[in-house]
């Protein structure tokens, strides 16, 4: 190992952190926060380590796909080991790429959920092979060993319970950091004018159409409420059925700067996820004062623990009547619900997720 090097933090993650996504958003916050505190940051991922052939495996070639999941962790870990020096204060990994042995350095594994929990939640919607891979290979082998002999971190009490149940690790709940000055209440009328929205109620969905996100609920609410303008901000392709709905306006790959405008233009946001460790889009919407109608998952269970907020929580993703009832409830008095969110949720969210508070908690847990 080299000596007399400046303090650095290594981040080990499956792909580039510049992409859209909750895990990537978290790592962008963390990398920027380390740099602001005087640390150098190096990010090791599948596209800057290892042979090009293994960077984008063909999911239709099952053996290649399976091997790539293991080899990403090997090449990422090997590159990190070769770069280690005496100034590396922490190696922070996540997902399935933190299992490579790195001796003599402090390590932490951040669990953004578990693949085991995700596999169980979406089992009816994926092939048996995919379920078995998620449950046994990704979760019980790669993810479990990625957390072994590290400081285990996670984003909610729900996920802490999963980690202990499946892996036997006692994780620290540290939530996520969130820029609450960026995601703040804005003038609804101005936001709607920017988006050129018609008069009338506005709903919102931000996310993807993967099986975990419960997108059919969004389609159904839009179809049953033609008077409602439904904003749908998604990553990736849209299902064909959505194009036939005249009251749906789609925004693909919405940028970070646009998100507060979207949240503040809406009377409510929908989060019907089957599995969500702690959804950034829920926290972002709530930080803007926007009520989120949600199935039970990490973020909704965290913030909707007291009256009248439980009225925004459905029994499950499949509780369509619960979503209908909550939509009617919010639209009957949208300003009242905004006031409830700003009074009861935003102060707690600030305490948990404001960057200065989050960093104090994180630094204490990992010993920096």
Where on the chain are the PLM-derived regions?
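Aromatic "clamp/platform" in nucleotide-sugar-dependent glycosyltransferases that forms part
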Residues: 274
């Amino acid at each position: 190992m080299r000596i007399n090097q400046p303090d650095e933090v290594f981040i080990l993650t499956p792909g580039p952190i510049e992409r859209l996504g909750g895990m990537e958003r978290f790592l962008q916050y963390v990398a920027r926060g380390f740099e602001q505190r005087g640390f150098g940051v190096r990010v090791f991922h599948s596209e800057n380590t290892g042979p090009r052939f293994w960077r984008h495996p063909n999911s239709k070639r099952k053996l290649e796909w399976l091997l790539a999941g293991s080899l990403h962790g090997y090449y990422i870990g090997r590159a990190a080991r070769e770069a280690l020096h005496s100034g590396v204060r922490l190696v922070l990994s996540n997902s399935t790429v933190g299992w490579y042995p790195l001796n003599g350095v402090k390590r932490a594994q951040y669990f953004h959920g578990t693949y085991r929990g995700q596999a169980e939640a979406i089992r009816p919607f994926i092939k048996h092979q995919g379920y078995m891979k998620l449950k046994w290979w990704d979760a019980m082998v790669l993810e479990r060993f990625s957390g072994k002999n590290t400081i285990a971190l996670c984003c909610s009490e729900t996920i802490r319970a999963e980690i202990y149940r499946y892996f036997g690790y006692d994780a620290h709940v540290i939530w996520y950091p969130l820029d609450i000055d960026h995601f703040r209440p804005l003038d609804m009328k101005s936001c709607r004018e920017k988006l050129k929205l018609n008069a009338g109620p506005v709903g919102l969905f931000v996310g993807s159409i993967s099986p975990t996100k419960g997108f059919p609920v969004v389609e159904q609410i839009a179809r049953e409420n033609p008077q409602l303008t439904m904003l749908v901000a998604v990553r990736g392709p849209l299902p064909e059925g959505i194009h036939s709905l005249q009251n749906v306006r789609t925004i693909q790959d919405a940028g970070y700067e646009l998100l507060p405008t979207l949240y503040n233009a809406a009377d409510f946001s929908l989060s019907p996820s089957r599995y969500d460790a702690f959804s950034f889009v829920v926290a972002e919407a709530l930080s803007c004062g926007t009520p989120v109608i949600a199935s039970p998952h990490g973020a909704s269970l965290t913030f909707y623990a007291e009256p009248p907020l439980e009225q925004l929580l459905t029994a499950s993703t499949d509780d369509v009547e619960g979503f209908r009832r909550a939509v009617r409830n919010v639209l009957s008095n949208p300003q009242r619900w905004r006031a409830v969110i700003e009074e009861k949720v935003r102060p707690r969210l600030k305490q948990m997720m404001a960057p200065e508070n989050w960093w104090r908690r994180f630094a204490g847990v990992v010993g920096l």
